Amino acid sequence: MPNPVVFFEIGCKDTAQTREFYGKMFDWNVAETPTGAMIDPKGGIPGQITSLGHEPHQYTIFYVQVDDVAAAISQAESLGGTKIVGPIPIPIGTFAWISDPGGNTIGLWKPK
């Protein structure tokens, strides 16, 4: 697969409650962080629970790894999608959020 799904994010208002729910529901290792929690699903795709983000806080996003975040945003726009935010550089890579023509939010990710 040339552009694999590599990460997911669950947005919420109550990170403690959300951590407890997903940890117990799916037997995931959920480690508390200053902004929520990192999820290690024991062999699956890693993710995070966070209270950071936009309104509404309740959302789920999967991230697709791309070679060039800006180029992927341009391609999405040419296909009828919309840039929501980004590209945003962070210490371990660059990400963006786009929406497809139906309004679904998708994350784009390029590691350093």
What are these model-predicted stretches?
Residues F21, A70-Q75:
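Short amphipathic alpha-helices within nucleic acid-binding modules
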Residues D27-Y59, T105-K110:
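Conserved short beta-strand elements that form part of the metal-binding/catalytic scaffold
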Residues G36-I39, A71, I84:
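A structural feature recognizing the 12-helix transmembrane core of secondary solute carriers
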Residues D14-T15, D67-A70:
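Helix N-cap motif at beta-to-alpha junctions
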Residues V6, A37, T60, T94-A96:
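Short beta-strand micro-motifs in enzyme catalytic cores
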Residues F7-D40:
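N-terminal first-folded block
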Residues M1-R19, G44-I45, T60-F62, P111-K112:
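N-terminal beta-strand motif that seeds the catalytic metal site of vicinal oxygen chelate
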Residues I10, I73-K112:
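Vicinal oxygen chelate
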